[in-house]
């Protein structure tokens, strides 16, 4: 019967992505944010499992998946809206914001390298992991330029975002971080676009700070990751 499904049309990839995502979103809200029901994580697992169990080639999924991927960059640009609304905060605290994000992102890149070295990962794997702090649209080209594996980088970016989306807000509440600027910067710097989505649940200030973090982290990754790769790999 599977041969008769419309697997060669864009609808197959789109539905395989959206149906698990919608169901997971419902379950995520019903369970008060249980991390295993994080929509992106569930969609990824269900999609991979379905393709493996049915024997359908990834190329069939990619026809529709590419359409969804097309909207990735325009969706990222939309994060500029809360940033514009709270531009007064950005003007007032721009030194602290820029300094905190720069130090945090650079430290994260160095830590990724040190951990990877400790586990004796190959240079290709290390290069694949270095750009994971940026969005997919930025991380993949950087990974390719420094000798990384784009598929591995994509997985690292997704897992990084899923972890922050699932646990970031809980950690902020656990450590009683009440400053909206600090909350937004923490989520945006560590979790890129999914961190921004998580920050939006707190408020407009958090969302705007997370948005500027996403942009600055991307710029830092583009500059620092190739330098680290040249010096250390």
From Swiss-Prot:
Keywords: Cell membrane, Cytolysis, Membrane, Transmembrane, Transmembrane helix
Membrane topology: Multi-pass membrane protein
Cellular compartment(s): Cell membrane
Transmembrane segments: 7-27, 33-53, 63-83, 97-117, 124-144, 152-172, 212-232
InterPro entries linked to this entry: Antiholin-like_LrgB, CidB/LrgB
GO biological process, alphabetically ordered: cytolysis; killing of cells of another organism; programmed cell death
Superkingdom of the source species: Bacteria
Main location: membrane
Signal peptide annotation: none
Any GO CC annotation of this UniProt entry: plasma membrane
Role: Inhibits the expression or activity of extracellular murein hydrolases by interacting, possibly with LrgA, with the holin-like proteins CidA and/or CidB. The LrgAB and CidAB proteins may affect the proton motive force of the membrane. May be involved in programmed cell death (PCD), possibly triggering PCD in response to antibiotics and environmental stresses.
Family of this protein: Belongs to the CidB/LrgB family. LrgB subfamily.
NCBIfam families the UniProt entry points to: PRK04288.1
Family annotation (PANTHER family): PLASTIDAL GLYCOLATE_GLYCERATE TRANSLOCATOR 1, CHLOROPLASTIC (PTHR30249:SF0), PUTATIVE SEROTONIN TRANSPORTER (PTHR30249)
Name assigned to this protein: Antiholin-like protein LrgB
Biological source species: Staphylococcus saprophyticus subsp. saprophyticus (strain ATCC 15305 / DSM 20229 / NCIMB 8711 / NCTC 7292 / S-41)
Lineage, highest ranks first: Bacteria, Bacillati, Bacillota, Bacilli, Bacillales
């Amino acid at each position: 019967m599977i041969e008769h499904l419309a697997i060669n049309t864009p609808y197959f990839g789109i539905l395989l992505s959206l149906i698990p995502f919608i169901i997971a979103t419902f379950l995520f809200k019903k369970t008060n944010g249980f991390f295993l029901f994080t929509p992106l994580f569930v969609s990824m697992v269900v999609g991979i499992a379905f393709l493996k169990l049915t024997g359908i080639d990834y190329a069939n999924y990619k026809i529709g998946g590419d359409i969804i991927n097309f909207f990735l960059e325009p969706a990222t640009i939309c994060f500029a809206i809360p940033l514009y609304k709270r531009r007064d905060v950005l003007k007032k605290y721009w030194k602290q914001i820029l300094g905190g994000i720069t130090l945090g992102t650079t430290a994260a890149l160095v830590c990724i390298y040190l951990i990877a070295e400790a586990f004796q990962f190959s240079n290709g794997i290390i290069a694949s992991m270095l750009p994971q702090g940026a969005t997919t649209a930025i991380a993949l080209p950087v990974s390719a330029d420094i000798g990384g594996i784009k598929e591995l980088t994509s997985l690292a970016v997704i897992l990084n975002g899923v972890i922050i989306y699932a646990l970031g807000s809980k950690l902020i509440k656990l450590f009683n971080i009440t400053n909206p600027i600090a909350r937004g910067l923490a989520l945006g710097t560590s979790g890129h676009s999914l961190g921004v989505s998580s920050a939006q649940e707190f408020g407009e200030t958090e969302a705007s700070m997370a948005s500027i973090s996403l942009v600055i982290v991307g710029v830092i990754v583009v500059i620092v990751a190739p330098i680290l790769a040249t010096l250390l790999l």
